[in-house]
Amino acid sequence: MGAPMAVILIVEDEVFTREVAEMTIQDWGHQTLSACDVEEALSFLRSAQPIDVLFTDIYLRKLVTGGCDLARQAIALRPELRVLYTTGNLVTDKMKALFVEGTRCLRKPYTPHELQDSVVAVLAA
């Protein structure tokens, strides 16, 4: 088997949701890294580990903008990183203003097809 198509860091505090996203993305040939919170994600981002996409929940451990804050820190560390947000909550204009420019948001619950379309779109951007 060849090299993975992309390395995707999944940041999700809900274990089941994170594991399903991991399995789904791996089924398409991508490599995944997973983190349950901002601190764990930042340890990956500060390492030499290649990462192409940050796929992060917006609400992490009751931090209303945890994923948005993480994305800004991630882009500061890795300007070439692509970001895909996810949330089960309504995304308001106020929330969108916190997004890193040029990013997308996938609304939960999402289907594997919707996740795949979003990952493909983010990688193509």
At which residue positions do the language-model features occur?
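As written
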Residues: 96-106
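Acidic, metal-coordinating helix/loop segments flanking the phosphotransfer/catalytic sites
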Residues: 22, 34-53, 61
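C-terminal output helix
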Residues: 110-122
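Two-component/phosphorelay signaling modules centered on CheY-like receiver
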Residues: 15-33
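Conserved acidic carboxylate
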Residues: 12
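Conserved phosphotransfer cores of two-component systems
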Residues: 46-49, 73-81, 98
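Conserved phosphotransfer microenvironments
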Residues: 57-72
